[in-house]
């Protein structure tokens, strides 16, 4: 890369940096990016850069692979139904241990090593995420969000800290639930009036043709996104991600993005370049 190209990149990013300075961006961190050391380190640096230029990133994470690893160590077979983990009490204890005690703190340490300041919390802290059991309760302690109490986030964000939130919620009676991190991210984004919701995934974004990498939907709106689901263009695991984005936009989030976390620095490419890298959905 020559000097002219470097200057061009910085010039392209400048208006986006100015536009998003002081704005909150909620990022769901998951998929392969959590397992590959190079991708993890690139993500930590990207979060640090966002914070350094004045953006307020809030990171929500799951931790499926790590949970499965610990279940295997403890000789417990993970069970899934319709893509959701069947979570009994013993499994829930492991989910809490792994998400809150290991995955969360690994992310915090990774970001802090860059010189930025991250703070790890869960949905239990400050009663941030209130929940109830999902559907008829057949998935056990799998939950859905009933209310977000974002007050605990305000002092952290205002002081320049980066909140790292594990997707555990609880009922008013104190029963913990394992909640899909995509939906937690969407609900938190809505509750804090975030500028953007960004989901890091193991796909390019929404594809019009499932196996055609050239069919990426680069930009769409709420109505078109709903149509993509109704017409079964969006299928399988992309359905809940798209629905999560739709719900967040309907509650006031300005833009939602589904991007490929397997690409290094995809976060910065989506936020700070003209073309982006994934799918952007707007109201």
Swiss-Prot record:
NCBIfam families: argB. It is found in: Cytoplasm. Substrate binds at residues 63-64, 85, 178. This is Acetylglutamate kinase. Its EC number is 2.7.2.8. GO terms for cellular component: cytoplasm. It is an enzyme of class 2 (transferase). The keyword Kinase applies. It catalyses: N-acetyl-L-glutamate + ATP = N-acetyl-L-glutamyl 5-phosphate + ADP. HAMAP family: ArgB. The record marks 28, 241 as: Transition state stabilizer. Its main location: cytoplasm. GO terms for biological process: arginine biosynthetic process via ornithine; L-arginine biosynthetic process. The keyword Lipid biosynthesis does not apply. Pfam families: AA_kinase (PF00696). The gene is argB. One of its GO terms (molecular function) is ATP binding. PANTHER family: N-ACETYLGLUTAMATE SYNTHASE, N-ACETYLGLUTAMATE SYNTHASE, MITOCHONDRIAL. Belongs to the acetylglutamate kinase family. ArgB subfamily. Keywords: Amino-acid biosynthesis, Arginine biosynthesis, ATP-binding, Cytoplasm, Kinase, Nucleotide-binding, Transferase. Catalyzes the ATP-dependent phosphorylation of N-acetyl-L-glutamate. CDD domains: AAK_NAGK-C. Pathway: Amino-acid biosynthesis; L-arginine biosynthesis; N(2)-acetyl-L-ornithine from L-glutamate: step 2/4.
């Amino acid at each position: 890369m020559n000097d002219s190209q470097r200057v061009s990149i910085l010039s392209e990013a400048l208006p986006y940096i100015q536009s998003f300075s002081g704005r909150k961006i909620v990022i769901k961190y998951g998929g392969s990016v959590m397992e590959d050391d190079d991708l993890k380190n690139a993500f930590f640096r990207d979060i640090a850069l966002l914070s350094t230029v004045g953006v307020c990133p809030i990171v929500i994470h799951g931790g499926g692979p790590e949970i499965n690893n610990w279940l295997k160590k403890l000789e417990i077979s993970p069970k899934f139904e319709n893509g959701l983990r069947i979570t009994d009490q013993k499994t829930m204890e492991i989910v809490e241990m792994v998400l809150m005690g290991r995955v969360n703190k690994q992310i915090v340490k990774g970001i802090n090593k860059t010189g930025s300041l991250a703070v790890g919390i869960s949905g239990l802290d400050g009663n941030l995420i209130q929940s109830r059991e999902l559907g008829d309760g057949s998935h056990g302690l799998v939950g859905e969000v009933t209310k977000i109490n974002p007050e605990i986030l305000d002092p952290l964000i205002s002081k320049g800290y980066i909140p790292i939130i594990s997707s555990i919620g609880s009922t008013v009676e104190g029963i913990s639930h394992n909640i899909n991190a995509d939906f937690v991210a969407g609900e938190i984004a809505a509750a804090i009036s975030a500028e953007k919701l960004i989901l890091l995934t193991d796909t390019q974004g929404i594809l019009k043709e499932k196996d055609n990498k050239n069919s990426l939907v680069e930009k769409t709106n709420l109505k078109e996104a709903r149509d993509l689901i109704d017409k079964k263009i969006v299928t399988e695991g992309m359905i809940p991600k798209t629905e999560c984005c739709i719900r967040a936009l309907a509650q006031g989030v300005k833009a939602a993005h589904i991007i490929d976390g397997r690409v290094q620095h995809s976060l910065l490419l989506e936020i700070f370049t003209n073309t982006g890298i994934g799918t952007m959905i707007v109201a």
